[in-house]
Amino acid sequence: MNIKEKQFESDIEQYLIKYGGYTKDDQSNYDRDKAIDMTKLIEYIQKTQSKEWKRYQRVYGSDAQNKIYKRFNESVEMHGLLYILRNGFDDRGIRIKVASFKPETTLNQEVIDKYNANILTCTRQFKYSTENENSIDIVLSLNGIPIVALELKNQLTGQDVNNAKKQFMYDRNPRELCFNFNKRFLVYFCVDLYEIYMTTELRGKDTFFLPFNQGSNGAGNVGGAGNPENKDGYTTSYLWEKVLQKDVLMDILQRYMTVAIDEKINKKTGKKKISKKLIFPRYHQLDVVTKLIEDVKTNGSGKNYLIQHSAGSGKSNSIAWLAYGLANLHKNNEKIFKSVVVVTDRTVLDSQLQDTIYGFDHTDGVVEKIDGKKTSKDLRDAINNGKKIIITTLQKFPYIYDEIDDNTNKNFAIIVDEAHSSQSGNNAKKLKPALADTTDSLKEFAEIEGKEESEIKDSEDILVQELLTQGYHKNLSFFAFTATPKEKTLEMF
C-alpha cells in the first residue's frame, strides 16, 4: 500500500466525515484555556433544551454562556466527565444536559431528535496547549468537548505504535486541563498500519497502554497477537470503520465506559487509599457483547450461547455489559426479556457487577442482589416482580423452581459465570425449571432421556420434570461464560 505523509490521517478523517457521522472542524472557536468549544456546546443546548436555555438566560442574562461553562466545569471536577455526559448538571434548579443518547425504542420522536442533534466533530492537528503549538493528529469531540485522541504512526516512515506511546507519555503534559483524568479526553489511541494500543489516563512515564487489537485471526477466533490482514484497506481500519462510528462510540459512552474504584487500607497507617480507573472496553469485549446482543435482537429469546472468555481478559466487565444490554434490549419497541439473571459462585463478581451496572443506571431497583443475607423467597419475588437484573448464586436457585409464578410468555436471560462449574450437578438441573415455559410437549425430550438418565441419579418423577427443562425453550436464553469449556459443557451448548 502506497501511503504518503499525512495520507493515513486524511483517509481516517475522510471516512469519519463521509460515513461516521462527524463534521470537519477547524478549531476556530476552541478555547485552549477552558479545553472546550463553548459555541458548539451552546448550539447543542439551544437545539435540544430551548426552554431550559431561555430560563438560564433569564437568570444570568448576557453572562449565561460563562455561567454554563463555570457550572459545567465545577460539575466535571466533582463527578468526572463521564458522569456529566450521562446525567448533565443542575444550576439554580435548571437541569442542563451536555449530550443525548440513543433511545431503546422509536416511540418518542423528541428523544430521537435530541440524539440526532449531538454535534460530533473531527479535527486534524488539534492544538491543545496553552504553552506551545503542539498538536494531536486527530481529535474527536462531542458537542465541543474533546473526548477521543488519536496519535498516528506509519511504518513506511520508520515509526510505529511505540513512537505514539512515547509521544503520549513524554510530550503530552497530564497537567494540561484537556489531559486531566476524566475531565476531557476519555480515551487515547496509538495507531499504526498494523496495531492499536489505548489508555484512558496519561500518567507520564507511568502511562499504561492496553492492546486494542482483534487477534491475528480476527475477533472471536483462536489466534495470536496482532490483527488479520485487511485486503480492502488498512489493517487497523476497524477502529474508525466500527468503533468510532457515531452510534458505536455513543453506545460505548452510555453503556460500556465505567469508573472502577479500588479501595486499599494502608496496614501501617490504617488510612484508606482510593484510586479510580476509567474502563474502556477492549476490542474483544466490545465484539462479543455486540454480537450477542445483535443475535438476540434478530432471533429473539430461546437460544443458548457459550462464550470462551479467558481469565484475566475482563470477563467480569463483559458479563456486566451484557447484562445491562440484555436488560434494556427491545425488538419492534417491545422489551425482549422480563429479567436478566446472573448466576455466579463468586462474591467478588457480585460486587463488581453491581458497581459497574450502577455506574450506568442510577435508577433504584434496577439491580437486585440475592446474597447470603437473603432467602430464596427474595429471589422468587425479584423474578416475579420483574427486577431488570438479578444477581444470585446457584445454591439459591433449586428451592424456588416449583413455587415460581407461571412464566408463560415471559422471557428470561440467564448469564452463567464459569459455565462448567455452575452448569453441572443437581442445582443446575433445577435452574431451567424455575424459569422455563413448561407448556411445551414432553415428547420432544423423549429422545434425550437415555443420555440424561446416566447423568441423573434422582427419582424417575424428578427426572421427567428435569428432562422437560432440557433443550429448546422459546422463553429462556442461556449465556455461559467460561475460560475452559469441558466436554459436557460443549455438548450442552
Which residues make up each language-model segment?
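Signature of the SF2 helicase/ATPase Hel1-core->accessory helical subdomain module
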Residues: T157-V161, M169, T200-E201, F208-F212, ...
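Structural recognition of the conserved hydrophobic beta-strand(s) that form the central parallel beta-sheet
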Residues: F189-C190, I390-T393, L476-T482
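AAA+/P-loop NTPase substrate/partner-engagement loops
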Residues: T344-S351, I383
